[in-house]
C-alpha cells in the first residue's frame, strides 16, 4: 500500500511540475520565426502565413481540411485490399465500419468497433490512422489558439491567426518531435516496431497460435500524446506488445495528460493571465485526484459476487488495481480512451466515474486543446452567473460577456449532453440496438449509455460487452462523434470572433468578479458539478448506481 501511494504521488507531482513547463514550450513554439523548411511548406501548399483570418474563414478552413482528411481515410480503409503493406491480405472494410472508423479518427475519438490486428493492414494503420492522430490533435490545438487570441486582442476580428500556419506549426514543432522521441523510449522498453509478418507459435498445449506484429510503437506514441487512444491491438494497452512493463505503463499514463495540462498554461500565457490558468488547472487537478481516489477505493473493496477483496476481473495482474484505476480516470478525463484494463469489468461505481468524466464534456484536461476550450465554456457560464448574482455586467479577462457569448457557451455545453441522452433513449427502444447487448438490466443500459457518451464526448473507450460493429451502431455513433466534435468547435470559434471585436480593458473595474482566487475555484467547480453532472443523474441512477445496490444481493447481468 505504501508503494502504491508513493507511485500515485510521483505521478501527480510529475503532472503538476511538467504541465507549466510544457505550456511554456508550446507558447514559444508559436513565437518562433518562420524556418526555411516551414517557408518551403507554405510555398508548395500555396499558404500565405502572414494572412490572418476572421472566425468564419478559420472555421471554414478547419471544416474543409477535416472533411478531406475524413474522405481520404475512408477511401484507404474501404480499398485497403488494393493498397501496399498488407502482408495478411486483409479485405477492405465494409462501408459502415469504414465510415465509422474514418469519422472516429478524424474527430480525435478513436472509437474502434473492430480489432486492429485482425482487420487493418500496416498501411491503413500508419498512413491512415496514425496520420489522423496527428492532424485531429493539432486541430484541437488550433481552435484553442484562435480562442486565446480572440480574448487577448482589441477590436480586431482578423486576429485569430491563420489555420494553416497553426496546423503546420503544431504538427511540425510539437507533435512530430515529441512522438518521435517517445516512440524511441517505447521501443527501448519493449514495445513492438516492425514490418515483419505475424509469427506462428506452438503453445504448451500443442496448439498453433498466431502472434500479430506491426509498427506499434510509432502509433502508441501519438495516440497517447495526441489524446487519441486508438490501439494497434484490440485490447489496446492491455496487450504486452503495446504496454510491456510498469515503466511503459507509467510513461503512457503521464503522456495522456501532459499536453492537455500544458494547454492550460499555453492559454494563460497568450491571454496574459497565468494566475487564472493556475485556478483552472487547480479545478481540473482536484477532479482528477478525487476521481482516482474513488475508483481506487471501490476497485479495492469487497466484491460480494466473488467473495474476495478487490475487483480483479478484466485487469492485468502485472499492473494491479492502482495502475488500472489511474489509467481509467486519466483516459476518461482526457478525451483519450485508451485502456490498460477492461472498463466493462470495473465495479459499478468505478465504471460510473469513467462515464461521468466523459459526460462532463471532457473538460478536465480533455483532449489536446479541446479540453481547455471546452473548459472555457464553463468558465464563461460561471462568470455570467456570478455577474448576475452581484448585479454587474459580467466581464472576463477585461472583456464584456454578453448574450452572444452565453448562447454559444450553452450550445457547446448542452449539445453533446442532448446527443448522449437522445441517442441512448432511441437505442433502448430499437430492437436492432438491443440485440447487440450481451448483458441485460442496469449494466446493459450502462453499456449503451457509455457508447454514446464516448462517441459524443470524443473519448473512444467502451464497455466492450456491447457488440458495436453493426450498421446501426456504426452509423449512430459516427453521427454522435461528428456532432460532439464540431458542435462544440463552431460555437467556440463564434465566441472567439465575438470577443475579438471587443475592447479589452486592462483596468479591472471595482466590483468585477476575480477569476483567480478561491471564490472562482469554488464557483467553477460548482457549475461543472451542477450543470455537467446533474444533467445525467436520472439515467445514472437506473444504470451504474442501481447496479451497485443490486450487486450486494449477489445479482449480476
UniProtKB/Swiss-Prot annotation:
The gene is kdpA. It is found in: Cell inner membrane. The lineage of its organism: Bacteria, Pseudomonadati, Spirochaetota, Spirochaetia, Leptospirales. GO terms for molecular function: P-type potassium transmembrane transporter activity; potassium ion binding. It comes from the Bacteria. Part of the high-affinity ATP-driven potassium transport (or Kdp) system, which catalyzes the hydrolysis of ATP coupled with the electrogenic transport of potassium into the cytoplasm. This subunit binds the periplasmic potassium ions and delivers the ions to the membrane domain of KdpB through an intramembrane tunnel. It is a multi-pass membrane protein. Belongs to the KdpA family. The system is composed of three essential subunits: KdpA, KdpB and KdpC. One of its GO terms (cellular component) is plasma membrane. InterPro entries: KdpA. Keywords: Cell inner membrane, Cell membrane, Ion transport, Membrane, Potassium, Potassium transport, Transmembrane, Transmembrane helix, Transport. The chain crosses the membrane at residues 6-26, 59-79, 127-147, 172-192, 247-267, 278-298, 363-383, 410-430, 475-495, 520-540. This is Potassium-transporting ATPase potassium-binding subunit.
Amino acid at each position: 500500500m505504501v508503494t502504491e501511494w508513493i507511485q500515485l504521488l510521483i505521478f501527480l507531482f510529475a503532472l503538476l511540475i511538467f504541465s507549466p513547463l510544457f505550456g511554456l514550450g508550446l507558447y514559444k513554439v508559436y513565437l518562433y520565426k518562420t524556418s526555411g523548411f516551414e517557408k518551403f511548406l507554405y510555398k508548395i501548399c500555396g499558404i500565405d502565413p502572414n494572412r490572418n483570418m476572421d472566425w468564419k474563414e478559420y472555421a471554414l478552413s478547419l471544416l474543409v481540411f477535416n472533411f478531406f482528411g475524413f474522405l481520404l481515410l475512408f477511401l484507404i480503409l474501404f480499398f485497403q485490399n488494393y493498397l501496399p503493406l498488407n502482408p495478411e491480405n486483409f479485405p477492405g472494410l465494409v462501408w459502415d465500419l469504414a465510415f465509422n472508423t474514418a469519422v472516429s479518427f478524424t474527430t480525435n475519438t478513436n472509437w474502434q468497433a473492430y480489432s486492429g490486428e485482425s482487420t487493418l493492414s500496416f498501411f491503413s494503420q500508419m498512413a491512415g490512422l496514425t496520420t489522423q492522430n496527428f492532424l485531429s490533435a493539432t486541430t484541437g490545438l488550433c481552435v484553442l489558439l484562435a480562442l486565446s487570441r480572440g480574448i487577448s486582442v482589441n477590436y480586431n476580428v482578423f486576429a485569430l491567426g491563420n489555420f494553416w500556419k497553426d496546423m503546420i506549426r503544431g504538427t511540425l514543432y510539437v507533435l512530430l518531435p515529441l512522438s518521435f522521441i517517445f516512440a524511441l523510449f517505447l521501443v527501448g522498453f519493449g514495445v513492438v516496431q516492425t514490418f515483419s509478418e505475424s509469427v506462428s507459435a506452438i503453445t504448451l498445449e500443442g496448439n498453433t497460435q498466431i502472434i500479430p506484429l506491426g509498427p506499434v510503437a510509432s502509433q502508441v506514441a501519438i495516440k497517447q500524446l495526441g489524446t487519441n487512444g486508438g490501439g494497434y491491438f484490440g485490447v489496446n494497452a492491455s496487450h504486452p506488445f503495446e504496454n510491456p512493463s510498469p515503466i511503459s505503463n507509467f510513461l503512457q499514463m503521464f503522456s495522456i495528460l501532459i499536453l492537455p495540462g500544458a494547454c492550460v498554461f499555453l492559454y494563460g500565457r497568450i491571454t496574459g493571465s497565468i494566475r487564472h490558468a493556475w485556478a483552472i488547472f487547480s479545478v481540473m487537478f482536484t477532479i482528477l485526484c478525487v476521481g482516482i481516489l474513488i475508483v481506487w477505493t471501490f476497485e479495492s473493496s469487497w466484491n460480494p459476487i466473488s467473495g474476495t477483496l478487490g475487483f480483479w476481473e478484466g485487469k492485468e495482474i502485472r499492473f494491479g488495481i492502482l495502475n488500472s484505476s489511474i489509467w481509467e480516470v486519466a483516459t476518461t478525463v482526457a478525451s483519450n480512451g485508451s485502456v490498460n484494463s477492461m472498463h466493462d469489468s470495473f465495479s459499478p461505481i468505478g465504471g460510473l466515474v469513467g462515464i461521468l468524466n466523459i459526460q462532463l464534456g471532457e473538460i478536465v484536461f480533455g483532449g489536446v486543446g479541446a479540453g481547455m476550450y471546452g473548459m472555457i465554456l464553463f468558465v464563461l457560464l460561471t462568470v455570467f452567473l456570478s455577474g448576475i448574482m452581484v448585479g454587474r455586467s459580467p466581464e472576463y479577462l477585461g472583456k464584456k460577456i454578453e448574450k452572444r457569448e452565453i448562447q454559444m457557451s450553452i450550445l457547446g455545453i448542452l449539445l453533446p449532453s442532448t446527443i448522449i441522452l437522445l441517442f441512448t433513449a432511441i437505442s433502448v427502444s430499437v430492437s436492432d440496438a438491443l440485440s447487440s447487448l450481451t448483458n441485460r438490466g442496469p449494466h446493459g443500459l450502462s453499456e449503451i449509455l457509455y457508447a454514446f457518451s464516448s462517441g459524443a464526448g470524443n473519448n473512444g473507450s467502451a464497455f466492450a460487452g456491447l457488440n458495436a460493429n453493426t450498421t446501426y451502431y456504426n452509423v449512430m455513433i459516427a453521427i454522435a462523434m461528428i456532432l460532439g466534435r464540431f458542435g462544440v468547435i463552431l460555437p467556440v470559434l463564434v465566441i472567439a470572433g465575438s470577443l475579438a471585436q471587443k475592447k479589452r480593458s486592462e483596468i479591472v473595474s471595482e466590483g468585477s468578479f476575480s477569476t483567480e482566487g478561491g471564490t472562482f475555484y469554488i464557483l467553477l467547480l460548482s457549475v461543472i458539478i451542477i450543470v455537467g453532472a446533474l444533467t445525467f443523474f436520472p439515467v445514472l441512477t437506473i444504470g451504474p448506481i442501481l447496479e451497485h445496490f443490486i450487486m450486494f444481493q449477489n445479482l449480476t447481468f
